[in-house]
From Swiss-Prot:
Family per similarity comment: Belongs to the universal ribosomal protein uS2 family.
UniProt keyword list: Ribonucleoprotein, Ribosomal protein
Domain of life: Bacteria
Protein name (Swiss-Prot/TrEMBL): Small ribosomal subunit protein uS2
GO annotations of cellular component type: cytosolic small ribosomal subunit
GO molecular function per UniProt: structural constituent of ribosome
Protein species of origin: Azotobacter vinelandii (strain DJ / ATCC BAA-1303)
Pfam families xrefs: Ribosomal_S2
Taxonomic lineage of the native organism: Bacteria, Pseudomonadati, Pseudomonadota, Gammaproteobacteria, Pseudomonadales
Alphabetical list of PROSITE patterns matching this protein: RIBOSOMAL_S2_2 (PS00963)
UniProt xrefs under InterPro entries: Ribosomal_uS2, Ribosomal_uS2_bac/mit/plastid, Ribosomal_uS2_CS, Ribosomal_uS2_flav_dom_sf
CDD domains according to UniProt: RPS2 (cd01425)
A GO BP entry: translation
Length: 246
């Protein structure tokens, strides 16, 4: 398992927290000190916690489990979409719709509608409609794609959730908590770590830091899948050679 290093985190600026006046006392144990009224996160505490979270992700991926990537603030959305797509995991990058997990039955119906509209847009149905009706359906399709496009292939509730800014995604976390879905989350000095099972204390705003978290989690997913594949192939090879010998 390849691990994130202290140097990786320092280069990405993961140690810069928020202004001291905005701190959350629950994050006190992860704060090293302050510089120019900015809290500095103790990366000696973050590093093992981050690597523990990555190890958990790798194990989940090896077991063919689904991890939902969540990051809906503007600075994180594009990276969430790209990294989740790179490792073929579901994601929410635009807006968390209340009930996305706790009312999944309704969400599933909306996904079905999204698929119907996708088919209609490709099979010539839109071309047969009036201009107004075609425009309305196109708008519906775009709206559904923006909200649900990242989870349309999820096929059921995820086995874990990875969150970039825990304050921004508090509704998503509370839904996961209600359903017993483990939460991995980047928690900055102004946020509460409550409801997060795998806490990664770190800067949740700097683009380079966000890229490091997402890229590392996506890499852990790909590694886990690869290891699972290697294991299966090895077992099959052993079974085949034993059969040949028998």
């Amino acid at each position: 398992m390849s691990q994130v290093t202290m140097r990786d985190m320092l280069k990405a600026g993961c140690h810069f927290g928020h202004q001291t006046r905005y701190w959350n006392p629950k994050m006190g144990r992860y704060i090293f000190g302050a510089r120019n009224k900015i809290h500095i996160i103790n990366l000696e505490k973050t590093l093992p916690m981050f690597n523990e979270a990555l190890s958990f992700v790798e194990k989940l991926a090896a077991g063919k489990n689904k991890i939902l990537f969540v990051g809906t603030k503007r600075s994180a959305g594009r990276l969430v979409r790209e990294e989740a797509a790179r490792c073929s995991m579901p994601y929410v990058d635009h807006r968390w719709l209340g009930g996305m997990l706790t009312n999944y039955k309704t969400i599933r119906a909306s996904i079905k509608r999204l698929r119907e509209l996708e088919t209609q847009s490709q099979d010539g149905t839109f071309a047969k409609l009036t201009k107004k009706e075609a425009l309305m359906r196109t708008r519906d399709l775009e709206k559904l794609e923006r909200s649900l496009g990242g989870i349309k292939d999820m096929g059921g509730l995820p086995d874990a959730m990875f969150v970039i800014d825990v304050d921004h995604e508090r509704i998503a976390i509370s839904e996961a908590n209600k359903l017993g879905i483990p939460v991995i989350g980047v928690v900055d000095t102004n946020s509460s770590p409550e409801g997060v099972d795998y806490i990664i204390p770190g800067n949740d705003d700097a683009i380079r830091a966000v890229q490091l978290y997402l890229g590392s989690v996506a890499d852990a997913v790909l590694r886990g899948r690869q290891n699972a594949g290697t294991g299966d192939e090895f077992i099959e090879e052993v079974a085949a050679s034993e059969a040949a010998e028998g």
